[in-house]
Amino acid sequence: MDLPALLPAPTARGGQHGGGPGPLRRAPAPLGASPARRRLLLVRGPEDGGPGARPGEASGPSPPPAEDDSDGDSFLVLLEVPHGGAAAEAAGSQEAEPGSRVNLASRPEQGPSGPAAPPGPGVAPAGAVTISSQDLLVRLDRGVLALSAPPGPATAGAAAPRRAPQASGPSTPGYRCPEPQCALAFAKKHQLKVHLLTHGGGQGRRPFKCPLEGCGWAFTTSYKLKRHLQSHDKLRPFGCPVGGCGKKFTTVYNLKAHMKGHEQESLFKCEVCAERFPTHAKLSSHQRSHFEPERPYKCDFPGCEKTFITVSALFSHNRAHFREQELFSCSFPGCSKQYDKACRLKIHLRSHTGERPFICDSDSCGWTFTSMSKLLRHRRKHDDDRRFTCPVEGCGKSFTRAEHLKGHSITHLGTKPFECPVEGCCARFSARSSLYIHSKKHVQDVGAPKSRCPVSTCNRLFTSKHSMKAHMVRQHSRRQDLLPQLEAPSSLTPSSELSSPGQSELTNMDLAALFSDTPANASGSAGGSDEALNSGILTIDVTSVSSSLGGNLPANNSSLGPMEPLVLVAHSDIPPSLDSPLVLGTAATVLQQGSFSVDDVQTVSAGALGCLVALPMKNLSDDPLALTSNSNLAAHITTPTSSSTPRENASVPELLAPIKVEPDSPSRPGAVGQQEGSHGLPQSTLPSPAEQHGAQDTELSAGTGNFYLESGGSARTDYRAIQLAKEKKQRGAGSNAGASQSTQRKIKEGKMSPPHFHASQNSWLCGSLVVPSGGRPGPAPAAGVQCGAQGVQVQLVQDDPSGEGVLPSARGPATFLPFLTVDLPVYVLQEVLPSSGGPAGPEATQFPGSTINLQDLQ
């Protein structure tokens, strides 16, 4: 249809400038049979806050409107509203420029016979028109024409949300979303801001993006991006100016928030310790440390007597009563634990899977935990955070955990609430840990090994080395540093094998049979050695062998004192030197106390004894009459003799497993010949002399087994000797040459004299030990013969040797290491110097000085 010509002049906006509705005008006349009217509307552009229209009436030609001062686009719309209630025809609009065309895109359809039927109530005709290639939405509601055009993308980003024009409807919202294709509107501005967050990623809203790979943060300003980059670099440029604080922050806002804490540090004061806190919450948390044992909140559930410190803990506990139907059960096979929360079940499952994701980052710690709470509790140890202090006056102890303080508080009450549940045991303890240690005594096996007090006058038995050690310190006044042998795990002896004080009547021949070689019908030396190694350290009471040590030797002799055990370990391939504690030869002799003669001394086989690793030692200079001589002694190579006397007690020889030790030191031809005539060891058991030692080494070497002496109370303990033996076994026999060179070097420097030899009718003097002959006489060796394979040499080593401090130890290919313990008094006589000129004779065997008794080194 053809539209009437539009006026070329723009229209004035009217009294209100801003898009609001104009002054109230009279409502349009009801649609009736009157002729159609023309309506003049002023349409505003989007620059003025959105499209809008103000209706106006005109009869006849419209007057020219006044000019508008604004720069916004305005155009005139002429409407023709038909009579009879038909749908109003949406007239096209045209800008006030000559020559522009109006294209009506949509209009109400009319029937063939006339106007269309009137629309139903509440239905407003709407359509779309295109003006100068711009789409506009047209809506006519109650005589008011509303035009709207969606803003372009560039306009949407620049236009700020403004209050929408108030239409005549009562429920029209005031703030519309500026995003394209979104027509939502909100009554309040903050609602629109929240809604705009859903349009994240819009172009131009966050142009400053983080350049780091993997970081998708974007910001509206460059300052915020710069502040964000500092978090990547771990920079904290804003430091607290308060002295002693030293904290730093990434932003000035965090620093200001921190400074408020300094300003409020003295607001909340603890009434107990006068400590101040910035917040009431921190004060309440601190006050719980003073009243931790008090649990004022009790569960009201019937049958539940649990108490809690805080109300929140009580409420958390109540869920266990009211949510029993929602328990989470552990699905691990064999575990039936249930939890009221899924998070607690998740933490519990980590105990089955071994997952411990929370790792302590402290230096050289490495502890891991299943939950963050346990990790935070563990960090208190590194920070020395002892927040739980004992409230008892004068105590002052503090703890890192509340349960530790609770256990400590019981000690102030004087009660022992933890009672042993075993029937018949009425032991009570103040700590649960003490009850746990006590309960292990009841579950020990009946046949568990027991250890006996090593003091000869004490017969106490113990089930653990700890109790035995405590007994030695408490009852026998032993110092802690003198009891290292009790630390060894092999110091326990089966109680069935301990000798009783009644087994004290033994003869000298019984003692020899006790250390006799392996019988012919035995399974072999290797098997015997393994049994000795597996059996541990055995103990023989000194009173059980007192008769063999001197007949009437009293056990409580004041010159001897309490005797420590002797540990015997076989070593046979180390040449003697000053670095070696004690070296004995083939024949080890037990000397009697008091005056002795050749016939009273019993010879013990060194091959059966093995190596002597630890001996008690005591200086007997205060008792010069302890060991004297009433006869002349002559040197003679004695051989081990077997006892033909029946043993009075057959159980004592069984205490020590007999071990056969093959000698590895060569003997001289003359000595070998004498051995054959004196019932010595067969020559076939001796290896070639060229295998281990040279000529000088042979002169200083011992016989079958090398015996190493170490005081039971010195720094070189039995345990260390055993460990060194193991190390030597790994290194091999490489220390033999070094020991020989050390010995030769000391001889050349004058620090050590070669062994002195004196031959007489009945004895040999070899080194520093006087070895009387056995009961069977034999031919004396020729004069000038050195101590060979069957000689005896003794060297004493102090607690701090001049060597490298490492106890030499070696093991030959056919040598075994039995660990044996014997309570035997051993006497080492003073070295007898050779007489100036003249042959060795009886006068050279006297004892000019005092003696040394190998007993306890206190």
Swiss-Prot record:
For this chain, the site of the Glycyl lysine isopeptide (Lys-Gly) (interchain with G-Cter in SUMO) cross-link is: 660
Please list where the region (Interaction with CIITA) is annotated.
781-858
Give me the stretches of Polar residues compositional bias: 675-687, 847-858
Q: Which domain of life is it from?
A: Eukaryota
Q: Recite the UniProt keywords alphabetically.
A: Activator, Isopeptide bond, Metal-binding, Nucleus, Phosphoprotein, Repeat, Transcription, Transcription regulation, Ubl conjugation, Zinc, Zinc-finger
- Keyword Hydrolase, does the record have it? no
| Compartment list | Nucleus
Q: What does this protein do?
A: Cooperates with CIITA to promote transcription of MHC class I and MHC class II genes.
Q: Name one GO cellular component term.
A: nucleus
A biological process term (GO) from this entry: positive regulation of DNA-templated transcription
In its record, the post-translational modification comment is: Sumoylated at Lys-660 with SUMO1, SUMO2 and SUMO3; sumoylation enhances the activity of the transcriptional activation domain.
Q: What is said about its interaction partners and assembly?
A: Self-associates. Interacts with ZXDA and CIITA.
Tissue specificity of this protein: Expressed at high levels in heart, kidney, liver and testis, at moderate levels in brain and stomach, and at low levels in lung, muscle, placenta, small intestine and spleen.
Q: What protein am I looking at?
A: Zinc finger protein ZXDC
Which terms does the record give in the GO molecular function aspect? C2H2 zinc finger domain binding; LRR domain binding; transcription coactivator activity; transcription coregulator activity; zinc ion binding
The top of its lineage is: Eukaryota, Metazoa, Chordata, Craniata, Vertebrata
Keyword Nucleotidyltransferase applies: no
Family annotation (InterPro entries): Zinc_finger_trans_reg, Znf_C2H2_sf, Znf_C2H2_type
Residue span of region Disordered:
1-127, 151-174, 660-696, 726-756, 837-858
Renumbered residue ranges of the record's region Required for transcriptional activation: 579-688
Q: Which residues carry this modification: Phosphothreonine?
A: 172
In which family does this protein belong, per the annotation? Belongs to the ZXD family.
PROSITE patterns reported in the protein's UniProt record = ZINC_FINGER_C2H2_1, ZINC_FINGER_C2H2_2
Bias (Low complexity): 23-35, 84-97, 151-171
Positions carrying Phosphoserine are 34, 665
**Source organism:** Homo sapiens (Human)
Which segments does the record annotate as C2H2-type zinc fingers?
175-199, 208-232, 238-262, 268-290, 297-321, 328-352, 358-382, 388-412, 418-442, 451-476
